[in-house]
Amino acid sequence: PQVKIHPAQQHSLEWLQARAGVVTASEFDNIMTPDFEARTGEMRQSYMCQKLAERWTGGSLPGFQSIDMEIGQILENEAIPSFEIEHNVKIQRVGLVLTDDGRFGASPDGLIEQRAGIEIKCGRPDTHVRYLLGRSVPDEHLLQVQGGMFATGLKEWVFMSYCRRMPPLIVRVDRDDEI
């Protein structure tokens, strides 16, 4: 499928405007359950009202950002070169990738040589250890990873959990077209 790539830096005003009214991979949990069933009720309705309001006004409000999230964004700048060197690949940073119709999108942390996307989480050390012990994409990020593949049309995604002074968790995920 055809996609549109917006080069705007993630979290910038231009990026927020490009996301206005778009159902994005990072928010798929508002419309689907972890078992990949359609959500019903207040959560879905609230999210869909937000997206409609964004379409009508042409703007998207910045979301809440904790200190841990800010630190995570900084650490992504360490994680990407680390992954590139370790795997001998080049990662293209992108702001937003939209489906051709503009209804769905994803903001991957990068595209690996146009064949896979990458989602990097740089959380707290205790969270990273939990991810390492699980050795798979944590349930709370699975919809985002599958949503990224849906929005970009890619068939492969890499989930990486990165924490300084610890081994990274790297999980390759294939697209599940049954979702």
Where are these regions (language model features)?
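Residue-level preference for nonpolar/small residues embedded in alpha-helices
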Residues: 75-76, 140
